[in-house]
Amino acid sequence: ALPAGHQEWTKWDSEVIGGNYNGHLGKGLSCKIQSTSGGVNHEILNKVKLPFSTPATLYRNSPLPSSSLALLTGIVENHAPEPVAWINQNSSGGKVFYTSLGHVEDFKKPAFNQLLKNGINWCIDQ
């Protein structure tokens, strides 16, 4: 139930973060993370050593809205690739960096931590 005085915002995912969440593949699958062709030269991926793997659950986010640019994709054997990191500029002009990664094991990987640092710096124009 929604809190009193609040309405449901069914398009929040697409309108604010530029996503399209529609479930996940489940736990226990190994996921390979690599750059997309459109994101390979983006500054957020500077010094991010790719590919890397994660035990994280792969979220289904395809297709992303046209305002979003996928930077990284996750690949699980026998499943379609899914975007796992992207940028978006929402309708109010806000710059968004999003990643569905964040399993506790991801934080042990220098590549993931560099991705987060770069994404934050990009959002604040540093």
Predicted regions and their residues:
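A broad, low-specificity signal marking well-ordered, structured residues that form hydrophobic/aromatic
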Residues: S68-A70, V84, V96-F97
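An acidic, glycine-rich "communication" segment
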Residues: A1-H79
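Hydrophobic/aromatic beta-strand elements that line small-molecule binding cavities or substrate pockets
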Residues: Y59-R60, V84-N88
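A residue-identity detector for tryptophan
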Residues: W9-W12, W86, W122
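Extracellular ligand-binding/catalytic regions of CAZymes and related secreted enzymes
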Residues: V16, E77-P81, Q89-Q126
